[in-house]
Amino acid sequence: MQPTNTQDPQYYHRVVDCQWACPAHTNVPEYIRLIADGKYTESYMLNRESNVFPGILGRTCDRPCEPACRRTRVEDEPVAICRLKRVAADLRGDVDHLLPKAPESKNGKRIALIGSGPASLTVANDLVPLGYECVIFEALPKAGGLMRSNIPSFRLPVRVLEEEIDMILDMGVEIRYDHRIESLKEMLGSGEFDSIFIGTGAPKGKELDIEGRQEADANVHIGIDWLESIHFGHIDSVGERVLVIGVGNTAMDCCRSSLRLGGNDIKVMARKSRQYFKASPWELEDAEDEQIEILVNHSPQKFVMENGRLTGMIFDLVEWDEDENGRLVSKKLGEKFIEADDVILAIGQDNAFPWIERDIGIEFGDWDMPVVDRATFMTTREGVFVGGDAAWGPENIIWAVEHGHQAAISIHQYCQDESVTDRLPYGMNLVSTKMGLHEWRYSNDYDPNLRTEMRYEDLEARLADIFVEAELGFDLKESVREVERCLNCDIQTDFTTNLCIECDACIDVCPTHCLTMTHNGEEEEVRQRLTAVAENTEQALFASEALPQTARIMFKDEDLCVHCGLCAERCPTAAWDMMQFDLLIPYAGQEPWPTTAPTASTTSA
């Protein structure tokens, strides 16, 4: 194996599993340490730099960071990263003086943002401080896109939503409400804008084209449209017996909303078994805690009407197996009629671009979607960019935020006549955490410590009012207990080869057997003869230069390390140190890092 290039920021970044998994690369360990220090405002602002909406995401994020959390190396449950984000948002002080501001003089460039969801708002957040005039076109009477229209208030209070949206709009963003764009060609032809960003989401709910659908139309609702109608006050009740078709997160929002609008017999109907559900595990748990019944292996076949009124649906009872090609095939076992007063369809979302003409230089590809470059977010027409769900279909808010950041970089470079593909690389700062010979300015308790359970509003109280937030959030005591579970994965081992005397002390003290000194070889073979076989090939092996006495190599399995620092504490020659890694993330208008190399390294005793 070749020695590991520790000058590459991606080496350290990959080891901070939570930050690596986050689409926006939020510095999770640092914001958790700030919470531990009671610095809630600083934690909030660190969050906001990358994910823009800490209060919103602290309640609604799909949490890609948590399955990656290194805490699961020592026990079953990850750190409650998402809920700690909410702690920072709930307990922060005033941040108005800390928010980015628009300069007094503009740069003369005008940007159109179609849609006011998280992607468009992020673009505005990044470009307005650079002097751009951003104009948002929103078809609805309020901003937020699907964050507003599709996430119920019992999960995301309107107060939290509007507070964080207003932080961006109050920079001086112009927004034109109730303004649906009917023709992109017309907008392009007006010459009013130097660049256009399309962030219209995936606004079209999928239909269920089966027998009786048209006849039952009055009592069959498209999930995302139904949730929007609830938010804007057009729907305030539902029938007692409700069937929700689908098992994604929208389906969970629909069934829980039905309970709060008068339904008392709510069933979620799934075509397949639980292992194929698309809903997040915690969304399923919340629904089932509210006594929602989920029926599996029920395939909808027919809406049943009597005397012009919907009475229920007929389902095929099925079982699933794989064919010779490994594809799932169903076998019908029978039929079942289930009563219903209302049916809500939550089986997916589609994009809709009837307003983008096909003769303006924008190519369309699979699923009638615009062809969008995955690095620059530009379409095949220069100056027109797409992000969020509008780019490649439905994803979570955090993905839309990252799309917005990347699109803002491209828009800025396009408007400054720079190449949109010439992007600043990530950088890093490395700072030693050493305070004394064997002391470090962080603590790391890798002993088992169970995840803190979320407290909920009383069931009767929350079901009585759709505006009552279900989750109460962590109190101070719970927050303290949960932050202690973080393993500080951004504080990483740093090895100096020429200081090593090959005494094996670090290997002896390592609690996870992640260190081995042995002769070199091909990686696949080396992985098999380490102290603990390194089976997870998605995590790198650290390989040192040849050691001075025996020419052996110090190997470290990054998958097993819990960042405890015992190797550095035990080492008699300081060959091991613990360095805090800070990923430098380029945003729109970012000046080059203060070094010609891709890293900026700082060491502090």
Feature roles, as predicted:
Residues 3-8, 85-107, 147-148, 152-166, ...:
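Flanking helices and flexible, charged tails adjoining ferredoxin-like Fe-S electron-transfer domains
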Residues 12-37, 58-86, 135, 173, ...:
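Iron-sulfur cluster-binding cysteine motifs and their immediate structural context
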Residues 88-104, 163-180, 205-261, 364-380, ...:
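Glycine-rich dinucleotide-binding loop and its adjacent helix/turn
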Residues 105, 110-114, 162-210, 302-314, ...:
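Feature captures the FAD/FMN-dependent oxidoreductase FAD-binding
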Residues 110-135, 250-259:
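N-terminal Rossmann-like FAD-binding beta1-loop-alpha1 element of flavoenzymes
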Residues 133-136, 140-176, 228, 255-302, ...:
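Rossmann-like dinucleotide-binding cores of NAD(P)H-dependent redox enzymes
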Residues 216-240, 323-394:
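FAD-site-proximal beta/loop scaffold in flavoenzymes
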Residues 254, 390-415:
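A conserved FAD-binding loop/helix module that cradles the flavin
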